[in-house]
């Protein structure tokens, strides 16, 4: 995974290309081993993925943290955020599962959930699709130039 510190109006982020059950399992293990408890999670994927095998991992990774589900833009294979949010919400109890039209909106929404103290242990996680990460870097190219932590 890649850490991006809070800057330019973005919350502290942890990015990972986990886009299948194997990748999500590895991501889950890595964040658990690092003692990371997400403040919020942004997840999206393509419609041709077998989402049923991915759902348990996303639910465990998010835990009680708010889960924001944008629709990946400019990709006809993208899964609709509202459909995906409905699937992810099942079994999450009162935890927030919120579809958003765009990644930029999800990033704004998640910032308010990051604690003022100990933000390094409570970043916003962004995962589920390499296309989602590509969209993030298109929106925020300056993050590619930052010194990575």
Question: Residue locations for each model-derived region?
Answer:
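C-terminal helical cap/extension that packs against the catalytic core
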Residues: 10-13, 55-123
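Eukaryotic N-terminal low-complexity, Ser/Thr- and Lys/Arg-rich leader segments
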Residues: 143-149
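Active-site-proximal loop/hinge segments that shape catalytic or ion-binding/gating pockets
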Residues: 129
């Amino acid at each position: 995974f890649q850490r991006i510190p809070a800057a330019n109006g973005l919350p502290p982020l942890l990015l990972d290309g986990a886009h299948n059950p194997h990748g999500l399992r590895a991501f889950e293990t890595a964040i658990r081993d690092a003692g990371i408890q997400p403040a919020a999670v942004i997840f999206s994927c393509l419609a041709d993925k077998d989402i049923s095998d991915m759902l348990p991992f996303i639910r465990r990774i998010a835990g009680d943290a708010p889960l924001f589900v944008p629709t990946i833009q400019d990709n006809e294979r993208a899964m609709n955020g509202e459909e995906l949010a409905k699937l992810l919400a099942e079994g999450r109890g009162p935890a927030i599962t919120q579809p958003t039209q765009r990644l930029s909106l999800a990033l704004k929404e998640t910032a308010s959930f990051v604690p003022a103290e100990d933000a390094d242990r409570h970043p916003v996680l962004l995962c589920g699709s390499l296309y989602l990460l590509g969209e993030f870097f298109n929106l925020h190219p300056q993050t590619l130039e930052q010194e990575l932590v």
